[in-house]
A protein has these predicted regions:
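Membrane-helix boundary elements
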Residues: 3-6, 17-42
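N-terminal membrane topogenic signal
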Residues: 1-11, 119-120
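Membrane-helix boundary connector in multi-pass membrane proteins
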Residues: 64, 86-103, 119-121
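Non-cytosolic membrane-interface motifs at loop->transmembrane helix junctions
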Residues: 33-42, 72, 96-107
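Hydrophobic alpha-helical membrane segments
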Residues: 73-88, 107-112
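Core segments of alpha-helical transmembrane spans in multipass integral membrane proteins
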Residues: 15-20, 40-63, 76-83
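Juxtamembrane helix-break-helix junctions at the cytosolic face
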Residues: 58-71, 92-93
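Membrane-water interface at the C-terminal end of transmembrane alpha helices
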Residues: 110-121
Length: 121
């Protein structure tokens, strides 16, 4: 395993989530959070889907573009992953989100965070 592979793996997860949020908004919201899929939440989910797609594209391309600076970008992704892990955990603990999806997301996000950190040192 190397840092380039971690970026590519995360890109795939982000792109899948982005496409799900963008094109299957009501399912993504209802299954992913346990909330009622209102038109407002679906619109927000579509916006979030585009953000996830863009982040997925960046994650896919960074190894090719960054060159020798890839470890610095990996550390930034580790920091971002730590923040995402913290907010997902906060939402789970406070009961703001429900279902299996948040647990899967927090585990995946934490694993990517650790991988980015350890392979970027």
């Amino acid at each position: 395993m190397n840092l380039n592979l971690i970026f590519k793996a995360q890109a795939i997860v982000l792109i899948i989530n982005g496409l799900g949020s963008l094109f299957f908004g009501s399912l993504w919201i209802a299954q992913g959070t346990g909330w009622e899929a209102t038109p407002d939440l679906i619109a927000f989910g579509q916006f979030t889907g585009v953000v996830l797609l863009v982040n997925g594209i960046w994650s896919w391309r960074f190894p090719d573009v960054a060159g020798e600076n890839i470890k610095s970008i990996g550390m930034l992704f580790a920091l971002g992953g730590l923040l995402f892990t913290a907010i997902i955990l906060f939402h789970i603990v406070t009961g703001a989100i429900a279902g299996a999806t948040p647990y899967i997301n927090v585990v995946l996000t934490a694993l990517f965070t650790l991988a980015f950190y350890f392979y970027s040192r």
